[in-house]
Amino acid sequence: MATNLMTPDPSRQSPHWDQPRPPVAELQMNPTTTGRVLLAWRRQQLAGQPRSPADLQPSLDWLLDLGAGVGRQQLQLLQLSPDQPVALQRSLDELAALWNRHLGEAVPLQYLLGLCPWRNLTLQVGPGVLIPRPETELLIELALQLVPSPPQLWADLGTGSGALALALARAWPHSRGLAVELSAAARTVAAVNLRVAPHVQLLSGSWWQPLAPWWGQLGLVVANPPYIPTSVWAQLEPGVREHEPALALAAGDDGLEAIRQIAAGAVVALRPGGRLLLEHHHDQSEAAFELLANAGLVALARHRDLEGVWRFASAQAPPNDAR
C-alpha cells in the first residue's frame, strides 16, 4: 500500500458505473435543492479552512459524487444553469456533517461513506479494512501481462477488502481463486465484495498456511502486504495512522516481515513456473529482490508505479527439474 492515503479523485470512473440510476419516483423522495444553493453550499464548505480551497475541492467533489450522486460533469452544468433542480442522495446537512468529520477528525471519506471506487469496481470498505489505493490497480495490469493465459488456480494473500481478488475474478471468470485474510473485520467486508464472485473462496489465516491443501498448484499469487517500517509510522498522515488498521500497514523495524514470510513459502506453494507478484515500499526494491532470490525463486523482475517508482516485484517458481 502507499504510505499516505490518496485524495479521492472525482475525475476517475464514476463509482456508480455498474449501478442503474434510481427511477424517477425514487429520486423524487430524495432531498432536492437547486444548483445555485448547492454551489453556494460548496463554496461555504471550502471557505475558512487551514488548507486552500484548491487542495480541498477534489475531496469535497468526491463526497458530492459518491455521497450525493452529483458528479463533476453535473456540477459543471449547474454553473451554466444554476436554477436547475438537483436531487440529492443525502441532504446538505448530512453532507456537511460528513465533511466536518473528515476535516476535524481526519476520518477518510471512504470510511464515512462505506464505499471506495477502485479500478472499475465500487468496493465496500469500513474501519478495520485497508482502503485500496490507485497504484495497487497496477498489480492487476501486471498480472494480466505476466500471465496472459488464465491459470487454473490463483491466490490473493492478505486480500483485505477483496479488491485484488475481485478484479482477478472478473478478468478470469473460469479460473478458481483463493483469497486469504487474517483479520476478521476485513474478512467480513471481503465476503460482501466477493459475493459476486462465487468462484473465489475466502480463507481465514496468515499468508500460506490456509493454502496448504493447494501447495504446488498455484499458477499465480498476488499480494499487497503490510510494508511500512516502524520508523515511518509516526510520519503517516493522520487519516492513515489513526484510522486504518495497523495489521494491514506495519511490518516491523525494516518493513519486510510480511514480504519475508511470503518469499519463504513461495517455492513450495507455487506450481513449477507459477508466478508471484507483490507490492512493496518505495525503497524496498533491492531488499525484496534479495529475499525472493534467496528463497529460490527465479526470473525476478521489478516494475514501476504510476510515478516511476520501483513499487512491485515479480518472480517465478523454478521448473520441476530445478527444484
Question: Where would I find each of the regions flagged by the language model?
Answer:
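Conserved AdoMet
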Residues: 62-142
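Conserved SAM/SAH cofactor-binding pocket of Class I
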Residues: 138-235
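Class I S-adenosylmethionine-dependent transferase superfamily signal
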Residues: 143, 168, 240, 262-266
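Mobile active-site "lid"/loop adjacent to the S-adenosyl-L-methionine
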Residues: 227-258
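Conserved Class I SAM-dependent methyltransferase catalytic core
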Residues: 253-316
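Flexible, glycine-/basic-rich loop-and-beta segments that form/coincide
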Residues: 319-323
